[in-house]
Structures are given as structure tokens and as C-alpha cells.
Amino acid sequence: MAWSLRAWRRARALRRGRLDDALWRRALGRFSFARELDAGDAARLREWVTLFLHDKTLSAAGGLDLTDTMRVEIALQACILILELDIDSYDGWSEVIVYPEGFLVDQTWTDEAGIVHQGKVGRIGEAWLRGPVVLSWADAGAGMEGAESNVVIHEFAHKLDMLNGPADGFPPLHKGMNRAEWNQVFRGAFGDFRLRVRSGLGTRIDPYAAESPAEFFAVLSEVFFMAPQVALAIYPAVYRQLKLFYRQDPAARLALPVH
């Protein structure tokens, strides 16, 4: 009965919230990872985007004029992560707040000498446990052609990571996935990446990934969708784990060799 009620509610939301065809085609055309989808995947993504916009409140802040085009483009980027999962993956919270540009937040941190500092720091995105996602449109709208980073994918990867508690780079894995293997692969890659960054070695992956296991997972999720060839070349074992987790293979969509 509960399943039937949920299916009915979804069907009603899809009917009432049908996206404008021209708007949807434009949104698909702006993102390389969306243009690569076949017709069936694109149709499913459209359903998730429609349900996302039905379920979540997208609120403007800082004087931003949040248009329908912007809403759809944010939702599309958020929903590519759950294309082969379910919209329920984003249950438990209700709002996306969008600023025109980067924003300031209060933060307390401890430096390497053990001294505690307090102050305001700049952000282009944040994800709160059981709370909103906060985005800078200047950056959310930049994750398009040729980009290898994507703040929307980054923050929504954190949201998936938070399904089993505070973000720690260890989201709830699907049945059949090996927790020990995930841990071994990600710990090894994270340690290697931190060493690269601290040694001043060049890398195409954002150095911010060295901040913590949670940030490593979120940044590698960006690369997985935006530049799968980079993830394959640098951390193929991580790519394989993300392929299992997201149940997608972006490299195959590009006809790239998979190791």
C-alpha cells in the first residue's frame, strides 16, 4: 500500500511538474555528461529532475534572480549522481539555497600549531547534514563545457556520503559491494594524493581533495562525471569503486578504454 501511494504521488508530480521541452533540451545541451546519455537514460534523468524540483525548495539569496532555467540546470547536475539510484537518495532534507556568487560562513578551525581560530571564510558550496545545500550560482553555472570540476556534483556527493552520518568519504554501499575493498582503495589513493600535493607535484585533480577523506570522495566524484579519463588515468581502482557505487560508467559513454 505504501509503495502504491508513493508511486501515485510520483506519477502525479511528474504530470503536474512536466518540464518545458525547449528548456529541457537546452539544459541537456549545456552539460557534456548529459549529452552523452542515450534516450532512455535522458528520459529517466528528466523524471528525477522533475521530482527533485517538486520535492525541494530552491531559494534565492543575496539578491539573486533565480530563473526556471537555473533551477533546472542545478537539478540536472544534482540528479546525474542518482541516475541509476533513486530520488529517495535525497530524502531527509528540503532546500537548496543559491547565492549569486561565493558567500561567507562562520568557521572555527585549528592550525598546525594547535591554535584555534574563528572567523569568516569564503565558500562556493556547502552541504549540511540533514540540512540544505548552499551553492554559488557563479560556480554552479560554470560546471559546463570543458570543465573538470563541478560544485553541484561535489556538494551532492557529500549528501550521498551523509546518508549514514557525517561526511567521511564512506557512504552506505550497495549490496554486493565490498566495504573492506572500498576502504583499502580510497585510503590508499587518498594517502597517495596527499603526498603528491604536499610534495608539490602537479595534478589535474583539485588539491582540495587532500583536505579529508570526505573531500577526496566528493572531488573524485566530480572528476568521475566531468572528466572520467582523468580518474581512469590517475586512480583506476577508485574509478572502479565509483562505477559500482553510482552504477554508471561515464568512460564507456565516451568510448574510453576502461582498465
What are the roles of these predicted feature ranges?
Residues M1-A22:
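Charged, compositionally biased N-terminal leader segments and the immediate start
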Residues L14, L23, G29-S32, F52-L53, ...:
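Metalloprotease/metallohydrolase-associated module, dominated by Zn2+-dependent proteases
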